[in-house]
Each structure stands twice: as structure tokens, then as C-alpha cells.
Amino acid sequence: MSRIGKSPVTIPAGVTVEVANGIITVKGKNGQLTQEFSDVTVTVEDGQVLVERSSDHKDQRAKHGLYRSLINNMIIGVTDGFTKSLELVGVGYRVSNQGQKLDLALGYSHNIILEIAPEVTLETISEKGKNPIVKLTSFDKQLLGQVAAKIRGFRKPEPYKGKGVKFVGEVLRRKAGKSA
């Protein structure tokens, strides 16, 4: 049995979980999230969410722990939320935002303007002498990761000097330059 899937998810105070017709809905102070599920049975009892599978088929074993983790992330999201920070490393790399529009200058001939989803709150930090930082916060972990990966994908860190967009705290694999 899945070690992750068999452990129940505790529902904290202020969070409501509803299960109906293969869809689970989690509501909390930060918002509401829904997730479809198949091949597993989700039940809510005694302030806990239980995920069970009907057989030991390979697909069901794979989805058992997955759906338990997704439900856990939904509950954490509507109570505490998630944060990701990206750092722009490079000369002339700048960032600014006007509402939900992110304006990135990453060394291309043009600025990249990205419309951020309304569920994600955006903050840009630019201090003199330090690398600019983009701070993203959301209650939806999947959407947050998707937006952060899209921003990072505009200029991935290169292995020689480390220039590019990287997550704060990310350790880059560096290469030695050519020897003379």
C-alpha cells in the first residue's frame, strides 16, 4: 500500500471539504480549490480526508499517493498559501510590475510583458546593488509553480557565469570555462 496515500489528511479549523461526483472542493480563508479524481475513493470523516483505492492495479497505486498529496496541498493552500521567489542574475536584467503585468528586461532586443493570473499576487523587489527579485504568492500550488516556471523559462541560468532567472536558494551546477 502507498505509504503517502494511506495516511489521512487532517482538516484544520476554518476549512470545509466537500466530495461529490468525483470532484473534491476545499474552501478556506484564502479561497476555493477544486480537483477531479478518478480510480480512488475519497471520504471525509471525523475531521480527516481519507483516500482509498479499490484494487492493487498499477494505475490505482500510482494515483493513490498523488491524490492524497494534491488534497493536502489544497488544504495547506487555502489556509497558509504558497510563496516562490525568483532572482534575476545578470547585468542590465530588470523587472517591474504594473498591477498583474510583469515587465522583464532580460537582455533581449525587447522587454517581455507577462500577464499574471489574478489568483497569483505579484511583488517585485529592486534594491540598488542587489539582484532584482520577483516574489509570487498564491493559494494554488500548481498554478504558482506553472507561473514561476514560465518566468524562469524566459532566461534559464547558464552554467558558466550563472546568469539568468533562478529560484532564490537554487543551487546551480557550474562548469569551468575553457583553459588557456
Predicted feature residues:
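N-terminal intrinsically disordered, cationic/polar leader segments
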Residues: 2-149, 153-180
